[in-house]
Design a protein with these regions (language model features):
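Short, structured protein-protein interaction patches enriched in aromatics and acidic/basic residues
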Residues: 261-278
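A short, sequence-level motif marking secondary-structure junctions
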Residues: 273-280, 308-314
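One-carbon transfer enzymes
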Residues: 1-257, 262, 289-306, 310-314
């Protein structure tokens, strides 16, 4: 599909200030899509009566590159390049919200990393379809943070799916999908960056297809589906029965995503801030041995070398 077909398509974009939103939005702008608005969750404000939607008109500014390891510019900086309005929302079901968004007259609603459920009265504003970019191979890892669960489950590959928005989260028909390998020890922020780039490419293709009525949705498979919520404390625990390679891969993955794995010897809890490698062998004595260069954590088949801090009594 020629991405040039995306040029001129009226796109209302939903996201938040993160790489998985900024990179696809950058791609839509570069492809020539007509960005008619950017919707983000409103920041918390004091007071009991929050306005359901607030419109801000950004001033036109210079084109900004995406930062390397940072999450890129805030979405309002990208919107300002093409003088697109920003909408901060607290209630997507409010009449005022629907009326304000209806004025943008979108052909396509494009969503990537937006944390709020989008109701049908908003989805229906798009005359050519409403789609979401999800960083997993749906139907596996539905939910708010699939990248964490890729590492928790030890997946050797994942991917990105663009699907139609429906009442059920992450369950709409698939319109585009691509696989991404997950190599041993791949840092989570690198995987996130890969997903953002693939998602951006797929989204531009999907908008181009929607512009000429060429979307070909297919139902998600009925097998292999999973849904995981936000990780809880126990999900961050490294089990002493794990192999050292599994623990190393898990920690390397989730630390750059903002999570801190932990380990317990049954009496004390140790928070892991960095992992430096693995070594074969088993030592006798404490499960955690400290040294001048960090700590050695005994696992099922070897030792995980890490930097740790003691977190108090066993959880």
């Amino acid at each position: 599909m020629d991405a040039a077909n995306a040029r001129g398509s009226r796109v209302l974009f939903f996201g938040r200030h993160c790489r998985l939103s900024a990179v696809p939005l950058r791609a839509l702008i570069d492809a020539g899509a007509n960005l008619v608005g950017v919707v983000v969750p409103a920041p918390p404000r004091p007071g009991p009566h929050a306005t359901p939607i607030r419109r801000r008109e950004p001033r036109r500014g210079p084109k900004l590159p995406l930062a390397g390891k940072a999450h890129g510019p805030a979405l309002d900086s990208l919107a300002a390049e093409v003088a697109a309005p920003m909408f901060e929302v607290t209630d997507l079901r409010a009449t005022a919200t629907r009326h304000a968004l209806a004025e943008t007259a979108p052909d396509v609603i494009a969503v990537s990393c937006f944390p709020l459920w989008i109701p049908p009265e908003v989805r229906s504003l798009a005359t050519r379809g409403a789609v979401n970019v999800h960083p997993s191979l749906l139907p596996r890892h539905r939910g708010p943070d699939p990248l964490f669960w890729v590492y928790r489950c030890g997946d050797t590959h994942t991917g990105v799916t663009v699907h139609l928005l429906t009442d059920r989260l992450d369950a709409g028909d698939i319109v585009a999908q691509r696989t991404i390998p997950v190599e041993p020890g791949l840092p989570g922020d690198v995987l996130e960056a890969r997903c953002a780039e693939v998602g951006a490419d797929l989204l531009v293709q999907v908008v181009a297809q929607a512009a000429i009525g060429a979307l070909r949705p297919r139902p998600q498979p009925t097998t292999g589906a999973s849904y995981e919520g936000w990780p809880e404390d126990d999900d961050l625990k490294i089990d002493p029965e794990w192999t050292c390679t599994r623990a190393w891969h898990f920690a390397r993955g989730i630390l750059p995503l903002g999570y801190q794995p932990w380990f317990t010897d049954g009496r004390r809890t140790f928070i892991i801030s960095h992992v430096t490698g693995v070594r074969p062998g088993i030592f006798v004595g404490e499960l955690v041995q400290r040294g001048p260069r960090g700590a050695a954590i005994q696992l099922a088949d070897g030792v995980l070398d890490a930097e740790i801090t003691e977190g108090g009594n066993d959880r």
